[in-house]
């Protein structure tokens, strides 16, 4: 399991991402202290890793969790039950209002979009992306709490 890391300008909630993660063109100015307890951070990391060890997440805009999926969809090894558990954990335990799924815009296919729509996600208009997400290269779906 990867270690948690926290930057001074955004929260990196799991250790799978690198600072130069594709899709993050800047970092939000959200203060990271006291947004989530260490217990919540460790639980969130565990839930994300249960879904896929290839996924990573960032806290952006103070009340939004952005989950970055690997750009190579052939590496996805997903558990629907674990993903639903992740959503339930976020709704019940975290002070967030929405979850963003961030996918490589070039590789998005209708099957993936349909699967996430079935779970309650909807496409987010690029004008509504947080400033730290590259609207040119990333397709975002949103789940509102």
UniProtKB/Swiss-Prot annotation:
GO terms for biological process: positive regulation of protein catabolic process; viral translational frameshifting. One of its GO terms (cellular component) is cytoplasm. Gene3D superfamilies: 3.40.630.60. InterPro entries: Acyl_CoA_acyltransferase (IPR016181), ODC_AZ (IPR002993), ODC_AZ_sf (IPR038581). GO terms for molecular function: ornithine decarboxylase inhibitor activity. Interacts with ODC1 and thereby sterically blocks ODC homodimerization. Belongs to the ODC antizyme family. Ornithine decarboxylase (ODC) antizyme protein that negatively regulates ODC activity and intracellular polyamine biosynthesis and uptake in response to increased intracellular polyamine levels. Binds to ODC monomers, inhibiting the assembly of the functional ODC homodimer, and targets the monomers for ubiquitin-independent proteolytic destruction by the 26S proteasome. This is Ornithine decarboxylase antizyme.
């Amino acid at each position: 399991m990867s270690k948690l890391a926290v930057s001074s300008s955004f929260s990196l909630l799991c250790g799978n991402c690198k600072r130069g993660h594709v899709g993050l063109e800047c970092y939000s100015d959200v203060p990271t202290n006291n947004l989530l307890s260490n217990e919540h951070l460790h639980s969130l990391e565990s839930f994300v890793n249960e879904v896929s060890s290839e996924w990573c997440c960032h806290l952006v805009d103070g009340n939004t969790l952005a989950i970055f999926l690997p750009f190579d969809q052939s590496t996805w090894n997903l558990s629907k039950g674990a993903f639903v558990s992740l959503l339930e954990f976020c709704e019940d335990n975290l002070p967030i209002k929405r979850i963003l799924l961030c996918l490589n815009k070039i590789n998005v296919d209708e099957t993936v979009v349909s699967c996430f729509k079935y779970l309650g996600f909807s496409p987010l208009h690029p004008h509504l992306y947080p400033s730290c997400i590259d609207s040119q290269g990333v397709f975002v779906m949103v789940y509102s709490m």
